[in-house]
UniProtKB/Swiss-Prot annotation:
Similarity field: Belongs to the DNA mismatch repair MutS family.
InterPro entries named in the record: DNA_mismatch_repair_MutS, DNA_mismatch_repair_MutS-lik_N, DNA_mismatch_repair_MutS/MSH, DNA_mismatch_repair_MutS_C, DNA_mismatch_repair_MutS_clamp, DNA_mismatch_repair_MutS_core, DNA_mismatch_repair_MutS_N, DNA_mismatch_repair_MutS_sf
Gene3D superfamilies hit by this protein: 1.10.1420.10, DNA repair protein MutS, domain I, MutS, connector domain, P-loop containing nucleotide triphosphate hydrolases
CDD domains named among the record's database cross-references: ABC_MutS1
Function: This protein is involved in the repair of mismatches in DNA. It is possible that it carries out the mismatch recognition step. This protein has a weak ATPase activity.
GO terms for cellular component: cytosol
Binding site for ATP: G602, P603, N604, M605, S606, G607, K608, S609
GO biological process, one term: mismatch repair
Name listed for the protein in its UniProt record: DNA mismatch repair protein MutS
Single GO molecular function: damaged DNA binding
Upper classification of the organism: Bacteria, Bacillati, Bacillota, Bacilli, Lactobacillales
Alphabetical keyword list: ATP-binding, DNA damage, DNA repair, DNA-binding, Nucleotide-binding
């Protein structure tokens, strides 16, 4: 970037840009934010705005682009959405009073993880993550700058770090240490994260827990340092850090949550078709965020689960009160976001009016809960602090029809400030005085069309047409001449105008000052507002669970101290809702305390995967405090759920690979305990038949002998059903079918014992494969059944030569296949495997 012979303003731009090389610099110049040089060229393309140049006649004109300051947020949103950072440089003094170049400073750096003022309101959290490392220990901290939530945990390996980042759906990671090339490739390329670095620690430790492990402390303090460095202001809404461990909740990795469609449908990526979609009858943005959090982190503490269940039961028992409650919640705005706007100094009159409306709804919500007269609700009622003094202040101060822009006037309610009322009186009386002057001069001059108008340039003036110029009184003085008329003033009109303008200016300044004082006063209540937000959110989620329990015919599950599972006529609630009017066929799931594995056989499309997901979904719902879809349900409290479910039953899209199968299987057998739930669907199908069968059997035996976790294992390897005779904690079940007149009907019912035949050819028939192909498949099947595992003779070839292609021959010919053949995947970490695959893919 050339800096020779620059104007003072451009030199100022260059100096500031040097400090923020990784961000688009929006440089305030009057009513526009301007961008120059590479920023202008890139922004013009990304934002689809005009690219022009400064000093067009120079040898090297400077590329320039700009956006209006009043609509800048929508352009900032686009840049942030695409993963860029934006530095905002504001004018720090009035250009009219500036001596030399106007003083400018960067007042905020907006990044994907620090967005607080988006033009697209969203009820989702936007977490900014920080990770640091000390030896083999990782510290992971994260916060939401909008809600002020702040958490930290310690993790033992980088795979767990990546899993937690995926669960948080973070877009930006602040790094406190130098990544290895392998780690950077995973975070930046595979996970598509924006990476930022922070080596300094935040000195003010009042938000930190000094009992944290060193690496957790550094991750937290570096996150705070990064946030303060980019936001450049006091962030009084940030809550003290809360330490957690992933083992404190029902553990599920990202793949498990995706395969179960917990917060979004894996196929569409949308909310519809997920558990979140099913359970969301919340009425507030805060409640929606909390519900999503509960789904992500179900409980393992029976006492806390039962506490939630009891509130849901109270709401079910009080239908009319619950209806009043939901109506009252509709009047509640997003307190957490309003509190953050106060902290960031971005509150406008509309925000304060929304806050007052919300606070005025709290006594009604509290009264409804108190009216139910249930001790179970006491802890919720205690959180509903209406803060009446704050509601009274805002209601008394802010005019109901106040504009959104602070400087537009008309913000403060009449009667709140005596001096301001006097200024307003002058403005009102001035208008009357002007009307009186107009009438008086019209009568005295005899000019029937004489009237007083106003514009910013000439102020108030008498408008006289050319035909009436001969009747203009002598005390009129000319202010402007137009083609068909002239404009005049008088000393009296000028005096009144001066009084009015002075009153307006003083009124505007005083009104702004009063609003700033009110905003500062509101800032003193941030902690109480956040506590209130948490209370309202909890009430909202629990009433939502009650509504869903009622409309979806759910029942309260029971938890035993043993490992027995007994779900009578259970249903997959999401599938049932998606099916609508169609009849959903329930299934009973029973596993005695001494049964650890159900081996499930049956054809594709028969419902095996749905049956497996049904159990996992029921467990998640139960442990987050929801009622469940069944006639009755007795469950243990699981500490973790592990799944390996591919593209089955039209629930999850995408094709699995053998490598992913083995990695996910390894994750399960490495971390599962006897209190875990494991779901394996067709494990081993990604490799040769005997390899797959051998691996499947060995995994079953390992779980049976060394782990003892409750396991549903669906397989096409019918030979594995013989394990029931040798593994005492394994039982066979199958999906029932009805065969009649050569037609197979899937009954979608799980019954004891192994399946007697696959019905795979019937599935192929449903898929529309050619009739002659299906006939040939029937013939081959009959020969296989008669000859055991011996292959049938090939069909007679009509051509002279048939070429059989060997994969092993191809491996010798293609260098990438040769490299794959050399890999010892069983002695490699998942991270190493993924890294090798990425490198090989780049060579294709």
């Amino acid at each position: 970037m050339a800096i020779e012979k620059l104007s003072p303003g451009m030199q100022q731009y260059v100096d500031i840009k040097k400090q923020y090389p990784d961000a688009f610099l929006l440089f305030r110049m009057g009513d526009f934010y301007e961008l120059f040089y590479e920023d202008a060229v890139n922004a013009a393309q990304i934002l689809e705005i005009s690219l022009t140049s400064r000093n067009k006649n120079a040898d090297n004109p400077i590329p320039m682009a700009g956006v209006p300051y009043h609509s800048a947020q929508q352009y900032i949103d686009v840049l942030i959405e695409q993963g860029y950072k934006v530095a905002i440089a504001e004018q720090m003094e009035d250009p009219k009073q500036a001596v030399g170049v106007v003083k400018r400073e960067v007042v905020q750096v907006i990044t994907p993880g620090t967005v607080v003022d988006s033009s697209k309101p969203d009820s989702q959290n936007n977490f900014l993550v920080s990770i640091d490392r000390e030896g083999n220990q990782f510290g992971l901290a994260y916060m939401d700058l909008v809600t002020g939530d702040f958490y930290v945990t310690g993790l033992l390996d980088f795979t767990l770090v990546c899993g937690e980042i995926r669960n948080l759906k973070a877009r930006e990671v602040v790094l406190g240490y130098d990544l290895s090339e392998e780690e950077e490739q995973i975070l930046s390329r595979q996970m598509n994260l924006v990476l930022s670095y922070e080596k300094e620690s935040f000195e003010d430790l009042h938000l930190l827990d000094l009992r944290l492990a060193t690496v957790e402390q550094t991750a937290s303090s570096k996150l705070l340092q990064y946030v303060h460095r980019t936001q450049m202001r006091e962030l009084n809404h940030l809550k003290p850090v809360i330490r957690y461990e992933i083992k404190d909740f029902l553990q599920m990795d990202y793949a498990t949550k995706a395969s179960l469609d917990l917060v979004e449908n894996a196929r569409s990526g949308k909310k519809q078709g997920s558990l979140f979609w099913l359970l969301d009858e919340t009425k507030t943005a805060m409640g929606m965020r909390l519900l999503r959090s509960w789904i992500h982190r179900p409980l393992i503490d029976k006492e806390r689960i039962v506490q939630r269940q009891e509130v849901v039961q109270v709401f079910l028992d009080h239908f009319f009160e619950r209806s009043d409650l939901t109506d009252s919640l509709k009047g509640v705005y997003d307190i957490e976001r309003l509190a953050s706007r106060v902290s960031f100094g971005k509150t406008n009159p509309k925000d304060l009016l929304q806050l007052a409306t919300t606070l005025s709804s709290v006594p009604r919500i509290r009264a409804i809960l108190e009216g139910m007269e249930q001790p179970t609700l006491a802890y919720l009622i205690a959180q509903l602090d209406a803060i009446p003094e704050l509601e009274s202040l805002i209601s008394a101060a802010i005019a109901p029809e106040a504009p959104h822009v602070i400087t537009d006037g008309g913000i403060i309610r009449t009667g709140f400030d005596e001096t301001l009322d006097k200024y307003x009186c002058v403005x009102r009386e001035g208008t009357s005085w002007i009307a009186e002057i107009e009438a008086k001069e019209r009568e005295n001059s005899g000019i029937s069309t004489l009237k007083i108008d106003y514009n910013k340039k000439d102020g108030y003036y008498f408008h006289v047409t050319n035909s009436q110029l001969g009747n203009v009184p002598a005390h009129f003085f000319r202010k402007a001449t137009l083609k068909n008329s002239e404009r005049f003033g008088t000393e009296e009109l000028a005096r009144i105008e001066g009084d009015m303008l002075e009153a307006r200016e003083k009124s505007a300044n005083l009104e702004y000052e009063i609003f700033m004082r009110i905003r500062e006063e509101v800032g003193k209540y941030i902690q109480r507002l956040q506590a209130l937000a948490q209370g309202i959110a909890t009430v909202d989620v629990l009433q939502s669970l009650a509504v869903v329990a009622e409309t979806q015919h759910l029942i309260r599950p029971e938890f035993g101290d043993d490992s027995q599972i007994d779900i009578r006529k259970g249903r997959h609630a999401v599938v049932e809702k998606v099916m609508g009017a169609q009849t959903y066929i329930p299934n009973t799931i029973q596993m005695a305390e001494d049964t650890s594995i159900q081996l499930i056989t049956g054809p594709n499309m028969s419902g095996k995967s749905t049956y497996m997901r049904q159990l996992a979904m029921t467990a998640v719902m139960a442990q987050l405090g929801s009622y469940v879809p069944a006639e009755s349900a007795h469950l243990p409290i699981f500490d973790a759920i592990f799944t390996r479910i591919g593209a089955a039953d039209d629930l999850v899209s995408g094709q699995s690979t053998f490598m992913v199968e083995m990695m996910e299987a390894n994750n399960a057998i490495s971390h599962a305990t006897k209190n875990s739930l494991i779901l394996f669907d067709e494990l081993g199908r990604g490799t040769a038949t005997y390899d797959g069968m051998a691996l499947a059997q060995s995994i079953i035996e390992y779980i049976h002998e060394h782990i003892g976790a409750k396991t549903l294992f669906a397989t096409h390897y019918h030979e594995l059903t013989s394990l029931e005779s040798s593994l005492q904690h394994l039982v066979n079940v199958h999906v029932a079918t009805l065969e009649q007149d050569g037609q197979v009907t899937f009954l979608h019912k799980i019954e004891p014992g192994p399946a007697d035949k696959s019905x795979g050819i019937h599935v192929a028939k449903i898929a529309g494969l050619p009739a002659d192909l299906l006939a040939r498949a029937d013939k081959i099947l009959x020969q296989l059944e008669n000859q055991g595992t011996e292959s049938p003779p090939p069909m007679r070839q009509t051509s002279a030569v048939t070429e059989h292609i060997s994969l092993f021959d191809r491996a010798e010919e293609h260098p990438i296949l040769a490299e794959l053949a050399k890999l010892d995947v069983y002695n490699m970490t998942p991270m190493q495997v993924m890294n090798v695959l990425v490198e090989l893919k780049q060579k294709l």
